From Swiss-Prot:
This protein's record includes keyword Chloroplast: yes
Protein name per UniProt: Large ribosomal subunit protein uL10c
One record GO biological process: translation
NCBIfam families in UniProt: PRK00099.1-1
Cellular localisation: Plastid, Chloroplast
Alphabetized HAMAP family for the sequence: Ribosomal_uL10 (MF_00362)
InterPro entries named in the record: Ribosomal_uL10 (IPR001790), Ribosomal_uL10-like_sf (IPR043141), Ribosomal_uL10_bac (IPR022973), Ribosomal_uL10_bac_type (IPR047865)
Miscellaneous field: Three forms, which differ in pI and possibly also in C-terminal length, are produced, L10 alpha, L10 beta and L10 gamma.
Quaternary structure (record): Component of the chloroplast large ribosomal subunit (LSU). Mature 70S chloroplast ribosomes of higher plants consist of a small (30S) and a large (50S) subunit. The 30S small subunit contains 1 molecule of ribosomal RNA (16S rRNA) and 24 different proteins. The 50S large subunit contains 3 rRNA molecules (23S, 5S and 4.5S rRNA) and 33 different proteins.
UniProt source species: Spinacia oleracea (Spinach)
GO MF term set: rRNA binding; structural constituent of ribosome
Gene Ontology cellular-component terms listed: chloroplast; large ribosomal subunit
Family: Belongs to the universal ribosomal protein uL10 family.
Keyword Ribonucleoprotein: yes
Length: 232
């Protein structure tokens, strides 16, 4: 007996299968194209910014240094140091007396330091390359002489004083020599004593005057001698 199988639908001759990859069904959450991160930009100080800050600090320190040296200062002078070697500058510092200070600073910074002070009279020197000499002594000629000696020995004729400020007054290059020839306090008092000892001196009659008047007169006489020496 033959048996026959009847189907409601004929069997397909070819069975198609569809293969789905795991990644298409379950996307990888760690795959870059499926995960977006916000971009974070970190700003760091640039070299230019750091350099500018350091430069500004140094400028402020220079101004403060100049102002400090101006305390108890009797004379501020500018010297043209163009062409100076490092060794020459070091030797010059050693040659100067202890009551003087020599520094190199930009004209603009020195000008800022002397602003609204009696030293503002030095402003005509604010050009060229200057080294600044601070004299912390009333004996101006004695303080300046070592530089003149150094200048002559090293044949630095071009490195002369470009100006100076003394008692709020500016002295140009040709007038600085007047400061170099001022009499010292010892010389002034010697002249004063000589005048007092002179029988015909008008000061002899003032010895009986009150002490306050005598002191005032002595100061006026000293000032007169200084002015005469400068004019001479």
């Amino acid at each position: 007996m033959e048996s026959t199988l009847f189907l409601s639908k004929p069997l397909p001759t070819t069975i198609k299968t569809t293969t789905h990859s795991l990644s298409s069904v379950y996307p990888n959450p760690f795959k870059p194209n499926n995960l977006t991160f916000p971009r974070t930009t970190h700003k760091h100080p640039t070299t230019t910014t750091i350099t500018a800050a350091i430069s500004r600090t140094k400028k402020e320190e220079t101004v403060e240094t100049v102002q400090k040296h101006l305390e108890n200062c009797y004379l501020l002078a500018a010297i043209n140091y163009k062409g100076f070697t490092v060794k020459q500058f070091q030797d010059l510092r050693k040659a100067l007396p202890e009551n003087t200070t020599l520094i190199v600073a930009k004209n603009t910074l020195v000008e800022k330091a002397v602003q609204d002070t009696q030293w503002a009279a030095i402003k005509p020197c604010m050009k060229g390359m200057n080294a600044w000499l601070f004299v912390h002594s009333e004996e101006i000629p004695i303080a300046i002489k070592p530089y003149r000696t150094f200048q002559k020995e090293r044949k630095l004729e071009d490195n002369d004083f470009t100006g100076a400020c003394f008692e709020g007054k500016f002295y140009g290059p040709g007038e600085v020599k007047r400061l170099e020839t001022m009499p010292s306090k010892a010389e002034i008092f010697a002249k004063l004593l000589g005048s007092l000892k002179s029988p015909g001196s008008a000061l002899v009659g003032t010895l009986q005057a009150p002490a306050r008047d005598l002191v005032f007169l002595l100061k006026a006489y000293i000032k007169k001698l200084e002015d005469e020496q400068q004019q001479g």
